[in-house]
Amino acid sequence: WSXSGDDDDDDGDSGDDDDDDGDDDSDDDNDADDDSGAEDDNDDDSGDENEDDTDDSGDDVKMIKPTTVMTGWMMTIADESSDDDNERDDTSDDSVGDDAYNDDSQAGELNSDSTYYDQLRSQGDVQSQQGFKNLQSYSNGFKVSSGLVATVVSTLACLFLTNLH
């Protein structure tokens, strides 16, 4: 085989053709490769989409952490308030305490129930106080009206007696 020039594709033609198809379009092929490079840039865009997905999953993990902290904080509040309820109630048995409530959900339910009954008790206190005030006003009104009736009756009796004479 003898080749003339710097032809490396062994097809017998001369020139700087390297793509084995006989024509001299290596510049165009390089442009096509550049286009595929642009497609590689599109692949980089898909890589950016993957990065966005990983960022979102990172945000999801961050969203879970405060919820866990908040749950622990709320359990602590429920435990402390159940201690207060047991100390405040003088009639409760000493054996009933935090040891009796192994499950935090039971302590939370009991705490919410005691809060509900505390609200009912305070409403009942307000209503009974209002009822007592109403009873006082009725009794005061009865005293005034009975006094007024007695005054009118005695005045009429005096007038009647004076007219007889």
Swiss-Prot record:
Q: Does the keyword Secreted apply?
A: yes
Where are the bilayer-spanning segments? none
Q: Name one GO cellular component term.
A: extracellular region
Q: Could you tell me where the Acidic residues compositional bias lies? A: 1-58, 80-102
Sorted keywords for this record are:
Secreted
Q: Hey, what tissues is this thing expressed in?
A: Component of the acid-insoluble and acid-soluble organic matrix of the aragonitic skeleton (at protein level).
Q: Where is the composition biased (Polar residues)?
A: 103-112
Top-rank taxon, per record: Eukaryota
Q: Where in the cell is it found?
A: Secreted
- Stretches the record annotates as Disordered: 1-112
The protein's name? Secreted acidic protein 2
Q: What is the lineage of its organism?
A: Eukaryota, Metazoa, Cnidaria, Anthozoa, Hexacorallia
